[in-house]
Each structure stands twice: as structure tokens, then as C-alpha cells.
Amino acid sequence: MTHTISGQYGRDTIVLETGNWAKQAHGAVVYKSGNLVLLATVCAADDAKEGQDFFPLTCEYTEKLYSVGRFPGGYFKREAKPPEHEILISRIIDRPIRPLFPEGYFCEVQLQVQVLSADGDVSVAGHALNAASVALTISDIPFNGPIAGARIGRINGELILNPTTKEIVNSDLDLVVAGTKTHIVMIEGEAKELSNEEMLSALRFAQKHIAEFVTLQEEYAKQIGVVKREVKLKARDVELLAKVKEYAFAKLTAANQTPDKTVRNKEISNVNKDVVEFFKQTVEDADKIKDIKTYLHELEYEIVREQVLNQGVRFDGRRLDEIRPISVEINPLPGPHGSSVFTRGQTQSLGVVTLGTGSDNQRYETLEGQKEKSFMLHYNFPAFSVGEVRRSSGPGRREIGHGNLAERALKLVLPKSEEFPYVIRVVSEILESNGSSSMASVCSGSLALMAAGVPIKGSVSGIAMGLFSDSSGKYAVLSDIAGLEDHFGDMDCKIAGTRKGITAFQMDLKVTGVSFDVLESVFEQAQRGRFHILDIMEKHISKASDSLAGTAPRIIVRNIPKDRIGELIGPGGKNVRGISELTGAELYIEDDGRVTISGSNQESAEKAAKMVDGFFAEVEVGKIYEGKVKRIADFGAFVEILPGKEGLCHISKIDFKRVNSVKDIVKEGDIIRVKVLNVDKTGKIDLSRKDALEEI
């Protein structure tokens, strides 16, 4: 049976249809908004795999290029490995949905959202999250939703729900927010140095609209008559759990007081081994032994949280708002254009900056067409940073997500291309990690940009905030969380910004929502922490270096008329190649007439710029030019005084004395000085070497 419902979501009319397409999926919905058509499907295994002790959820967002009537690029002409922007939207779907499955539910779940028809004015991220929630809500799969997603922009101080692709360009805020009827569960976005109050106002605005779409989903599920599966949870051995707690509580409590991550992990491991060996004397069942390991993890969770909530004590002895010790190094590497090392506790990021030219832009394909990026931040998280051994491969979803967050934090303080015409690549190499490595990347990246001479608007710092809460409403907000506190806490909230305001924000929860009272506490405490970090960073470098590295390219920009681009390029690129061969510089010409000239040194770039200027300069009567003899005739020499502009120096004007043969005085290829005597109506140029010599 087909079920359809429609409703208003801000300015958009949303239509939901099920029962016609993808009927064998456990949940499927066709989601429409204007010309945007999404198909969201979800399937779940009937039972968890034997021995499964985690929730295997896969979320995949895919853009089909046929949705805009285009062929995919590449040899095979089909969609292949997902590009970064699809991975980022997949993560936006995954992060708010994951904590809303029942605790202990370990059946494999696969959620897919596909763009079947695109609308160039509609931004997809919020709609994709909505479609995913609808598919889960109307399925028989256990899910503590529904939730809704909202993309929030702000233009001239006015908040906008689901701004168009054109509106978002002029917005000083770009947030994707997910929530239930009453609480926010996920935030991801960037802002142009907005205040805490402005950010909270945007979140309240989002929450109001989110509640509307959650209500629509509830009505839809009621219309369909959804019946959820029974969750099969493994029975707990209460007696064994009590014995484990009695034997291990004091040992685990002592081990958890160790501030050093490596030492602490070893001590916890030793306690766990000791407990397992002790109970093996009386417990023979292998499944029971595995249960003991689970109970030990639960006990550690209980110990860490009890210390924070009831004693106000963190495992490493810090106050709740205390930042770990910070150290900074500027330009530790001699070869790169700029570098820094930012260390906070046992988290360390090496930030490295490379300056490039227009040809180094990153080009990528989206539903809107080909796009280019002139700033990129790449985040690398090698196994050695956490003392592990694993196969090295390309960046995973986590690395792409962390890099994107740090990139968004920094890109809004970069100078405009007119002021600093370089392509910029920042790489964050995580050398060691104990929590908050993405925010360490923001700090090392900001420092390295200044060290490289990039005139950013201000230093940017980032901090990760945590939350411990209980069912009574008691909570504690933690600044600069370590890996242990991230693992056992309820929230990982990352906030980056300058002294003026916030530039990037990301929040993920392990609980079903967080109140605005808590969010206000988080923002206020995070700001104090960010400013403390900025104080330390700015003691080492507070403004961009006055000069670029010797190995950095030198760039000069020229703007030429769009209708004369072809003149500069020349037939088959002849002119551009000629300039490059003569000067060693490279030219990058954009469709709007912007010409970026880059040389390995200033002299090379200036020489090429002078030649570019020559193509569009007007010949001035009475001016002396240095030109190249291009051809020789019996009656004179043809001299190129500007690129593409030749004049005739008659034999009578080549020298003071009588000249029998032009070749007696000049030869092809000679560089000579000539004076412009006249330019007639047809553009013919009359030159004189003799007059130029008189003025020397």
C-alpha cells in the first residue's frame, strides 16, 4: 500500500511517499522538495553476529550525476569512490542517528540516501538527514527517533531555514543542526566570528523548526501503522557482575588515577588481566569470561563518571575547566614555507603550510558543476600517534571529517585572493594523540599560517568540551577533554574561533539530547578556554611573518579585459608559452580575466608581468622602447616594441651615417632602442633608431 504525506518545512513543501519504490527494503521513502528527489532506504539484519559487542551502522550518501543530466567523469563514466563532500554528508547523517538506537542493539544496519533528481537552488545536507530519519521511523527497525535536520544561514542578521545555494554564499553562518522535538543532538558548521549569543540564537531557531518536521514524521508513522521489532538483549549475570565489581572496583579506581595515557592503559590492562585470571579459577564458560571483560569496561565507565559528577575530580587531577599544559614551536622545519608544532598534554600536531599558484587549485565535481578550492587542510592520523600497529592506507572518513572541521575553522580568517593571491595547503600531522586532535590541528594550522607569512585576520584556537550527566539532571562540563573523557563522556563538542567570535563548531552526543542551559554553560566555559589557548599561542607569534620563505613562489596578479584573453594566450597558446620560456614564470588565466603570474623569484615574476602588460599597452608617440628585431628588409628593419606590436624602422632612420645595407647595422634577434615617431590611422608604427640614439 502506498502512503503519502506532505507538510511545510520553512519555505519548503516536503512530500513523503512510501510503498511504491524499493518495497523490499525494511524502510524506504521517496523524499521530495521542489525538484529535489531523494530515495532513503534502510535494512537491518535479523540477528547480531555471534560474539558481536558493538553496533555496526553504515550510512552512505550518494549523488547520482544523472540527477542533473550529466555524465560522470573518468574513463568508466560511472560513479565510483565517493568524493569528500559525499563522505561529509554521510557523516552528518551518521552522527545524530547512531546514539538513538537502543543500547545493546548490535544487529547490522545499512542506511542509504541517494540523490535521484537535484534542484540547483536546494542545499541537500539537511534534507538528506531528514530523509534518513523518515526511512528509519517508518521501518520496523528499533529507533528512538524521529529526528530532523535543519541547515541554518544568516543574512544581514536574519536567520534562514534551509537557505538556497545562492543565499548561503552571502551568509555569515552555515550550520547543520539535528534534533528531537525538545533537544539538539548534533551540530556542524562554520561562522564568520559570531558571538556565543548569536550562535545560541541560531540553535533555538533551528530547534523550533526541527520540532515541526519531527511532528510530521510522527503523523506519517501513525498513518502507516509502524510496528517495531523486539530488541533482543543479552541477559546479564547480575551475580557475576556484583562479584566482578567487588573484586575489581578498588584496583580500577587506583589505575584510573594515572594521568599518563600510556602508563594508565598498561595499568588498566594489567588489572583486567588479573581479574580475568582470578575468575577463570571458578568460571569455565568462555562466554562468561567474555562477559567479565564487558563488566570491567562498564565498571570503569561508572568509576570515571562518579569521580567527575560526585567528586568534581578528573582522572588526571585537573579542575573541570583546566586546560592541559601547552607548548609551541614556530618553524621547526627549514624546508617548508611555514610550520609549527602545537602540543597540548599528550596531543601533538605538526602543522605545515605550502603556498602554491592557481594551477595548484583543487578541482572537484559536484551536482552544481566543476568547483575549485584555493585553500585546503589535510589531517593525517598515523597509527604511531596512539602507539598502535595497523596497515597504512588513504584517509578514512574520520580523517576527512576532522580535516574538514579544521579547514572550516581557518578558512574564514584567510585574506582575500586580491590581497594574497596564493593557493594554500595546510597539513596537520598528528604525532601523538590523547583527545582533541582536530582542535590541535586548528591551533597548529593557525600558527603555521602566520609563520608562512599568510596575513590571516587573527589567531584561531580550538577546544574540545565534554559533558558528564545523570538521570537526575546533574551535569558537569569539562574543558579540553582527553581521550578517556571523550570515550566515557556524553558529549564531544568542538569550538574554534578568534577573540572576536566563533569560526567553526561541531557537537556529537551519546545521549538523546542536551538542553539549552547546558549549551550556554558549554559555550561560556569554552570561550574562557579558547582565550587561554590564544594567550599562549600569541606569545610565540601574533602576526604574520613580514616575508615569505625563500622557496615560496612569487606571485603578481594582473587583470585584463575578458574579451582580450585570447590575445594573451595566442594561437595554440603560443604567447603564454613564449612568456614562460623567456622568463621561467608560469601564467594561470581565469575566465574573468584575472592572470596569476608566478615565478621562482621576484625577478622572474616581474619580467613576465611586464610582458603581460605589454600585450595590452598602447603605443605612445615620442616614447623610446627597447625592442627586438624580428625581420629585415632592404628598406628597413621590423622591430617588436610590445608583444604583438611591430613597427618599421626605415633604413634612413637606422643610423646617422648613410647605410647601404640594414644588415650592416642590425641583425634579426638584436635588441635595439627605437623611438616612436608616428602611429597612423591604420595602426602602422613609424620607428627611428637614430632619434633614440640622439636622446641617450
Swiss-Prot record:
SMART domains linked: KH, S1
Catalytic activity: RNA(n+1) + phosphate = RNA(n) + a ribonucleoside 5'-diphosphate
Keyword field: Cytoplasm, Magnesium, Metal-binding, Nucleotidyltransferase, RNA-binding, Transferase
CDD domains (UniProt xref): KH-I_PNPase (cd02393), RNase_PH_PNPase_1 (cd11363), RNase_PH_PNPase_2 (cd11364), S1_PNPase (cd04472)
Domain KH: 553-612
InterPro entries: ExoRNase_PH_dom1 (IPR001247), ExoRNase_PH_dom2 (IPR015847), ExoRNase_PH_dom2_sf (IPR036345), KH_dom (IPR004087), KH_dom_type_1 (IPR004088), KH_dom_type_1_sf (IPR036612), NA-bd_OB-fold (IPR012340), PNPase (IPR012162)
EC number(s) from the headed UniProt entry: 2.7.7.8
Entry similarity comment: Belongs to the polyribonucleotide nucleotidyltransferase family.
PANTHER family named in the record: POLYRIBONUCLEOTIDE NUCLEOTIDYLTRANSFERASE, POLYRIBONUCLEOTIDE NUCLEOTIDYLTRANSFERASE 1, MITOCHONDRIAL
The name this protein goes by in its record: Polyribonucleotide nucleotidyltransferase
Record lineage: Bacteria, Pseudomonadati, Spirochaetota, Spirochaetia, Leptospirales
